[in-house]
Amino acid sequence: MMKRVIKLGGSFLTCPDLESRLQRWQETAPPAHCLAIVGGGGLINSIREIDAVVPLEEQTTHWRCVELLSHTFEIMKQRLDWPTIERVVELEHWIQNPPPLGKITLVRVDTFYRSSGSPVCESSIWNSHGSELLPENWKTTTDSIAALLAWGIHASELVILKSCSIPPEASLAQLAESGIVDQAFPHIAKELQNVRIEQLAVDG
């Protein structure tokens, strides 16, 4: 049973033809049971801009940005006709009883990724080791958070969909150095079976 995690870049929040682009991508992707998360886009960038002028406490800022991802989740939920997961128990049910192949389910990030002080139900598949894989600062973005989800569900592959072009021969370390993926990504990606980083093609 192939399981795939997809990360949609936050820049797609303002992409007018996102739905048709995703449909074309799905038509060419190998069949799999799919979970997806969405990045923070301009919401997170605004916090970066504030931090550049008035330095903020790293860990607090990290979790503040994670909280903002609930808003980008709601926006994408409104745009896309995808089922959603918003509670730990729903995620665990998906793992045990995934929907039909090809169906993409949108996951709210704080379903599986929370600060150490936040309560998570005892039946959760997530443990402290998962959180330790990611630094709680700007080195971690939704690229690495998607990788954490892929690691947690033992996904067959992780697909990072970007709006920018991807150098075909670049290593993960080189992609991190150029800012295409975050700095934590090369480390956590070592925990995964397969990783693909792709540009979501423009229609036409």
Give, region by region, the residue ranges found by the protein language model.
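Glycine-rich phosphate/pyrophosphate-binding loops
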Residues: 153-170
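N-terminal glycine-/serine-/threonine-rich phosphate-binding loop
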Residues: 1-36
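Ligand-binding beta-strand-loop-alpha-helix segment within the catalytic cores
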Residues: 48-145, 149-152, 176
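Short internal beta-strands
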Residues: 35-39, 160, 198-200
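Short, active-site-adjacent cap segments at secondary-structure transitions
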Residues: 12-14, 42-45, 113-114, 166-168, ...
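Glycine/small-residue-rich interface belts in oligomeric ring/scaffold proteins
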Residues: 32-48
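Polyanion-binding loop/helix "lid" in catalytic or ligand-binding cores
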Residues: 137-138, 142-147, 172-204
